[in-house]
Each structure stands twice: as structure tokens, then as C-alpha cells.
Amino acid sequence: MLRPSRTFLIDGSNAVYAVFGPWPETLKEQNRCAWDFISALNEWTLGTSEFSIELVFDGFYRAIPEVNRQKLRVIFSDEAKADSIILERIRSLIYFKEKVTLVTRDQDLAQEARRENAKILDPQKFWSMISRPL
């Protein structure tokens, strides 16, 4: 199966925070925000072959909603930093000639990603894209 030529790599907690505001105090509410974000991403991926999405969260695995695994990959960093995994994925994807857009507001991460030839997109702008039909 051919991979799409564009990958949106999303700095998970950073993007969810940018879209939904400060993280709630309880894990249950944090998970609800993440689930809402993942569900919207999944809905957006249905019916298109133009891109894939990789969503990277800090921390250990948590239950997530069912997703279209051919188009949406959810990664938990475990003990590593999400930023390190994101940069590793950018380098790998660029090496294989894919176009990469990083969705983040983290300016340090964005600067490093630009050095690797990734494009940067603000999470609010990305949310506006996925909130309307393709």
C-alpha cells in the first residue's frame, strides 16, 4: 500500500491545549479532551487518501477511541519526551521524501522542525481545517 505524500505530525498535548484551553485537573477530563480531539481527527481522515496523521502525546498509553489506523496513528512517548519522538519521525518521513507539516505552538520544537524542512501549522488553524468538510 502506498503511503500518502503528506503527513500531519501533531504535538498532541500542545495541540489539544491550544484548541480546548488549559488541561483540566482530573485525568478523566483530560482524557475527554484528548478523545474529542482524536475523534475529530479520525472523522476528518475518513474518505481521503491525500494525507496521514501521526498524533504524539507525552506519557504512557491511555485508552483511545477506535480510529482508522491506516490514516491516523496515535503514539504515546512512554518515558521519552514527545518532542524527541516528533523530531525523529520528521527526519524519517523527510528521508523517505514525504512532505511533513508539524502542528504545534511550541516555538523551540517548531524551530528544530523547520531545520529539518518540515512546515509548521498553528493548532487553531489546523482545527479550523478539520472542523469543516474536506
Predicted regions and their residues:
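Nuclease catalytic cores that cleave nucleic-acid phosphodiester bonds
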Residues: L2-F8, N14-L134
